[in-house]
């Protein structure tokens, strides 16, 4: 039996990524979208993230994508350039196999390598027993806020939980002028 491997996502993965996300939108509360985006829309989102230098990973086993994770800009304002927001989605039949943990571990390492300083998790339906909250806690994220009743999906109000993981010294040291976020910022000026 082969093991689960991580690699950078490519456009060839977009059909499966779209399928996994459609299930999360339709059946879950991790995303506050109500209608699954098309393959074309998912491709545009993918292209934008990759062009921005953000990490986008897939986990696969025997050539089948089991899940994906990416980091994107937390907010568009330039002072936030060292902060990314993570997203991780696992196919329904791959849940409980450690796929989310493996993806997040890889994503954290990729965000560190790029020079980011904080990873923010914005978790829909952030109940304390939710798989996403438990996963982020296991990885060292701490709770940094809750927006009560901030989303309405599947006939109920949902809380949004914010969790945070400082990396590369967080806010305790000045940013590295050679980091990806700083180089992109200087190029835009």
Tell where the protein language model's regions lie, with residue ranges:
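A short beta-loop-alpha structural element at the N-terminal edge
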Residues: 5-17
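Conserved GNAT-fold acetyl-CoA-binding loop/helix
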Residues: 18-45
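Acetyl-CoA-dependent GNAT
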Residues: 36-93, 104-105, 110, 166-167
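Conserved catalytic-core motifs of GNAT/GCN5-like acyltransferases
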Residues: 70, 122-124, 137-158
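Conserved beta-strand-loop-alpha-helix junction that forms the acyl-donor binding cleft
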Residues: 95, 121-133
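Conserved acetyl-CoA-binding loop-helix of GNAT-fold acetyltransferases
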Residues: 96-112, 134, 138
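Conserved GNAT acetyl-CoA-binding A-motif
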Residues: 111-124
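C-terminal "cap" of GNAT-fold acetyltransferases
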Residues: 149-189
């Amino acid at each position: 039996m082969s093991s689960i491997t991580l690699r950078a996502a490519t456009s060839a993965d977009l059909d499966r990524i779209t399928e996994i996300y459609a299930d999360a939108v339709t059946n879950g509360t991790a995303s506050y979208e109500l209608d699954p985006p098309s393959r074309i829309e998912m491709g545009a989102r993918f292209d934008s993230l990759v062009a921005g230098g953000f990490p986008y990973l897939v986990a696969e086993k025997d050539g089948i994508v089991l899940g994906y994770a990416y980091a994107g800009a937390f907010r568009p304002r330039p002072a936030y350039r060292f902060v990314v927001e993570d997203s991780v989605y696992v196919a329904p039949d791959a849940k409980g196999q450690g796929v989310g943990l493996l993806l997040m571990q890889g994503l954290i390492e990729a965000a560190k390598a790029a020079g980011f300083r904080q990873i923010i998790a914005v978790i829909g339906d952030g109940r304390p027993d939710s798989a996403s909250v438990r996963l982020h806690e296991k990885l060292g994220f701490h709770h940094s806020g809750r927006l009560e009743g901030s989303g309405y999906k599947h006939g109920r109000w949902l809380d949004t939980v914010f969790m945070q993981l400082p990396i590369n010294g967080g806010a305790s040291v000045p940013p590295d002028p050679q980091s990806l976020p700083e180089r992109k910022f200087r190029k835009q000026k």
